[in-house]
Amino acid sequence: MRTGDTRTSGLSTRPVHRLLQAHHSRMADVHMRELFDTDPQRFERFSLQVGDLLLDYSKNRITDETMDLLVRMAEESDVAGWRERMFRGDKINTTENRAVLHVALRNRSNRPVNVDGEDVMPKVNAVIERMGAFAEQVRGGVWRGYSGALITDVVNIGIGGSDLGPQMVVQALKPYRHPRLKLHFISNVDGAHVKETLEALDPETTLFIVSSKTFTTQETMTNAHYARDWFLARAGDVAHVARHFVAVSTNRDAVTAFGIDAANMFEFWDWVGGRYSLWSAIGLSIVLAVGAERFLELLEGAHEMDEHFRHAPLRQNMPVILALLGIWYNNFFGAESHAILPYDHYLRSLPAYLEQADMESNGKSVDRDGRVVDYPTGQIIWGATGINGQHAFYQLLHQGTKMIPADFIVSITPHTELQEHHDILIANFLAQTEALMRGRTREETLEEMGRSPGDPSVQHRVFEGNHPSNAILLKKLTPHTLGMLIALYEHKIFVEGVIWNLNSYDQWGVELGKQLAGRILPELHADAPVAGHDASTNALINHYRRMTQPHPGL
């Protein structure tokens, strides 16, 4: 644990913490096989349905007492109070003095939401209408390129929240996409990304969305300037830029200097965090892909989960339950990571999206009061599509030495007519959660294999089981259920942050590396040997220079 002032008002100081520690000691050796064998109603008591989402959390190392104590932890952490502060627009992002109002972006009730005394809903609704109108022009063939050709390809240039969220949603909703429009996403400042993407496109039929709040983000603007140069190499006239580039930004001067018409700048606000911004104008690529009506369905799904989260009792609250289970394993069992395992090809980018949403939010070691915490906080989030994962890393989940709780996610109704494929997928989804929970004892292994007790190979085929998992079943992957699913995880992250006494909505951890990169960049091509860093960094910079632009004496 880090040194420093560890006096904290967080998790470890709450009265229920000791009760949970004692309860964990009693639960440490309890196997879930016993819990299921002695309680035929376990699924009914530890499952919850909200709209078209079903959460089965019965395959967790919990009892009613566990959940009662964890809910008490949420109460002592004032989760309900912090939840209300967020929804009403209080500035709960204390380090940046900002409200946290991604929920306002999908507030389909249109109830007033005030920031600094102003209802933000009229501006939110106006931007949504502008996005829809623009998208319908492009989709309907009214908006065309400089040569009069239809737009066939849309390239979103952004990074972080301006990339991961929209890309994940566009990919997830591919069955709803416009048949003419292909969506592309460029984020990496590695030149291979932008070069390979643009090589396959035609400047006359390509529309670019440049997503940067300040219009100064280095990676995004480097790619945007390259894209503009690529475009002008064919189009010639800089005036044509306005037909092929739009912006999601708040910096009107920089946008117009780039050549984009200010009328084609879509704004968002400082109370929208990057990793929670897909609901805002950052989601313009989503609207272009699936249309305004489907985008509204996405917002409505998120709003349904928002309403559930805001009003349901903590014990019957889906995001709260997921968060409490995360706290249980992270802070009492010592689990350091959590796997996201979607059994749906269209959700294959969900793990990467949640990596940012969760780890950038709760990857903090200093609490709201500026004190270094004395307890573990954010989990390592990782994962992959389920079937592929089974043939890659599930070995460690089943027979490894680490506890790795997992979320299994599946759609009951597929988008394809390949029912046999889907039946196999569902069977594997169900089998994995059962195998992780129940395992296979030595006696069961001997019986199944027909081997003698002295056979040394038997132990290698024993499965301890008792590995926790949640199962999340969507009736079908639609814009509505996807909105619900994303909001479910957003609120889970919020609740965990409250219990850990963290500000989940800043990200100072990304700043230091960017500052140092700004210092190193000119040194890569300087004349004199570099000596202003540590020995390792100096040597690496000088090695790079020798390999790329040899300088005598380096």
Curated annotation (Swiss-Prot):
Signal peptide stretch: none
Pfam assignment, any one: PGI
EC numbers on record: 5.3.1.9
Protein family according to the UniProt entry: Belongs to the GPI family.
UniProt cross-references to NCBIfam families, sorted A to Z: PRK00179.1
Gene name of the record: pgi2
Function: Catalyzes the reversible isomerization of glucose-6-phosphate to fructose-6-phosphate.
Any one GO CC term of the record: cytosol
Oxidoreductase found in the keyword field: no
Enzyme superclass (EC): isomerase
Taxonomic placement: Bacteria, Pseudomonadati, Pseudomonadota, Betaproteobacteria, Nitrosomonadales
InterPro entries (UniProt xref): G6P_Isomerase, G6P_Isomerase_C, Phosphoglucose_isomerase_CS, SIS_dom_sf, SIS_PGI_1, SIS_PGI_2
Biochemical pathway: Carbohydrate biosynthesis; gluconeogenesis; Carbohydrate degradation; glycolysis; D-glyceraldehyde 3-phosphate and glycerone phosphate from D-glucose: step 2/4
Protein name as annotated: Glucose-6-phosphate isomerase 2
Catalytic reaction equation(s): alpha-D-glucose 6-phosphate = beta-D-fructose 6-phosphate
GO biological process: gluconeogenesis; glucose 6-phosphate metabolic process; glycolytic process
Cellular location(s): Cytoplasm
GO-annotated molecular function: carbohydrate derivative binding; glucose-6-phosphate isomerase activity; monosaccharide binding
Superkingdom of the organism of origin: Bacteria
Sorted UniProt keywords: Cytoplasm, Gluconeogenesis, Glycolysis, Isomerase
Keyword Cytoplasm: yes
Family matches, as Gene3D superfamilies: 1.10.1390.10, Glucose-6-phosphate isomerase like protein, domain 1 (3.40.50.10490)
Active-site residues annotated for this sequence: 360 (proton donor), 391, 514
